[in-house]
Amino acid sequence: MVGSVHVNGSVNGGNGTEERLDELRRLLGKSDGDLLKIVGIGAGAWGSVFAALLQDAYGRFREKVQIRIWRRAGRSVDRTTAEHLFEVINSREDVLRRLIRRCAYLKYVEARLGDRTLYADEILRDGFCLNMIDTPLCPLKVVTNLQEAVWDADIVVNGLPSTETREVFEEISKYWKERISVPVIISLAKGIEASLDPIPRIITPTQMISSATGVPTENILYLGGPNIASEIYNKEYANARICGSNKWRKPLAKFLRQPHFIVWDNSDLVTHEVMGGLKNVYAIGAGMVAALTNESATSKSVYFAHCTSEMIFITHLLTEQPEKLAGPLLADTYVTLLKGRNAWYGQMLAKGELSPDMGDSIKGKGMIQGISAVGAFFELLSQPSLSVQHPEENKQVAPAELCPILKRLYRILIKRELSTRDILQALRDETMNDPRERIEMAQSHAFYRPSLLGKP
């Protein structure tokens, strides 16, 4: 098979690509001439890159697969962004030539001059994600009508923020009422909802999707890993895990795997999905610490030790034998604390360039999912019905009382009663236990609360 040159200059040889596509088509019962239809829902940075990776790998097999992405229509591109986009276009000869060849360059000139308004769905068709202007993608097939996008899709990729997942999939369920075949859904969303009545419990994005659509949980998977979207599209080496039922996770891991993007499979959906939400929580604090200490490696490592011990403690509340915080799971946490929109947000707060009053949707960055997750985790873990034995004091306390960093973040971001500088006090508290003690306490299994996931 002849290799193909991509818009970003990379070459994708055969590498069994068509064979992997054929294998997945057979598993999904697709006959000759029947397209395998894949659609991404939501066009944030990672959702757009994920669709672009599939388009680069499989898009040339037009008689076998159709790859599209849905985003809402009507989002305009402001003048400042249009000017920056024009600079990006002219700095990349390959992109410039592509737009000229597609007769699409002139509209960017007009937008640069203020003579035309561009729209997010329009520029996405040309390969520009509004949340990631500096990293041009391949051109994408964009759909703005949700019903058209999903009604006959075989594989749906949820690229929505967790805060929007339930609402959009409830709408999608209306278009699936008469479906005969059940779609496969891959969720990229990181975050949770907290339900406090009738009993406190966590609701993850895959649970939201199953509840909204009636799609069985065995057909819903979660993909996560140490992934910075722009770096992955620029072919930086990365890996990820796709978690869920054995029926789908192994063939999908094989289908998604590329030379620079290695995908493994794992059965522990709960731990990976909860960790996906938790890491965004603690990434905001990591950004604050980095900015407040002038990028002190020592301070950041102290924060890392304490926040990972809290994460381990929380996952042991949720599942009796959670996946260990190691390998890709640890790497995902590390890279999110090191770099990403949540860490960036924490830095901007600490520098005074943003404030919590500005909300959780930031221009040029999209949704800061860690903010809502801070509120959800803290409010859930503050419920008296979940009380656990304090390791040193002879009394029952809510689990949140054993998570001092989470508590500080809640008071800074949600209650807004502390300044960002107070995050450092959580590290300097002389009464704080050694992180190892919190981990040992969690691993004793004394705190496992199956009700948090709706289990008896």
UniProtKB/Swiss-Prot annotation:
UniProt main location, coarse: cytoplasm
The answer to whether UniProt assigns keyword Iron to this entry is no
Give me the residues that bind NAD(+), please.
42-47, 190, 229, 341, 369
Q: What's any GO biological process attached to this entry?
A: glycerol-3-phosphate catabolic process
Q: Which GO terms describe its cellular component?
A: cytosol
Report residues binding substrate. 190, 341-342
Report the domain of life of the source organism.
Eukaryota
Q: Where is the active site?
A: 279
Q: Which UniProt keywords apply?
A: Cytoplasm, NAD, Oxidoreductase
Gene Ontology MF terms in the entry: glycerol-3-phosphate dehydrogenase (NAD+) activity; NAD binding
The subcellular location is: Cytoplasm, Cytosol
Annotated EC = 1.1.1.8
User: So what does this thing catalyse?
Assistant: sn-glycerol 3-phosphate + NAD(+) = dihydroxyacetone phosphate + NADH + H(+)
Q: Looking at the keywords, is NAD present?
A: yes
Q: Which family does it belong to?
A: Belongs to the NAD-dependent glycerol-3-phosphate dehydrogenase family.
Q: What does this protein do?
A: May be involved in cell redox homeostasis.
The name under which this protein is listed is Probable glycerol-3-phosphate dehydrogenase [NAD(+)] 1, cytosolic
Q: Which organism is it from?
A: Oryza sativa subsp. japonica
